[in-house]
């Protein structure tokens, strides 16, 4: 999805779910609790199922690759900006925290492509974002559409409430605030799942994104939904989950 938090028409990417900041010395312990998995979701746009998305987390040492592949269904090509065909985020989880290394996204056409590279020695993130050159200072709070998801899971596995995040948007960053919003039992094809709900919102924005994270499945999101006032813009609903 594109523009997960605040843009009309959809999400920033299936990979992008909520905020993260660099963790302290407990991050490595949290990384031991992360587990590779594959999950599929139905992408629902204005009440219509328009995509099937596959989310995969893979590990090589302290490096994690988080990928999302979306296939259009029905009129899904109209919503390719909401559910991009491919997104790949590479991060390292170390005793210094969650460190994004690179991010790539194909948004359905060349003008929607994103490619970011992180240089932690120079504290710079560079690349291109939908045709805009990116050259930004790199701080622990800066994340991309993929690294935020791993940050969320690491925070929750440590029993922390995720903090605010600065998410890259072209050659700038936007700050989003989110809070815990209760608990709920969600019916899924795999059975009922207990979830913790978080909501995210940019200051003064009418859009709110909510995330239902399964507490007994490593806090993997089983539902994500964005609303503008009372109007549901889009929803992701989990269909299958295989976790190592």
What is the meaning of each model-derived region?
Residues 31-120, 156-244:
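Acidic, serine/threonine-rich low-complexity disordered tracts
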Residues 109-151:
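Hydrophobic, well-structured mid-protein blocks that either form specific transmembrane helices
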Residues 13-25:
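Bacterial N-terminal signal peptides
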Residues 5-6, 31, 143-144:
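Intrinsic disorder/low-complexity signal
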Residues 2-16:
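Bacterial N-terminal signal peptides that target proteins for export
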Residues 21, 148-156:
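Short, Φ-rich (hydrophobic/aromatic) sequence segments
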Residues 24-25, 43, 127:
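Small side chains
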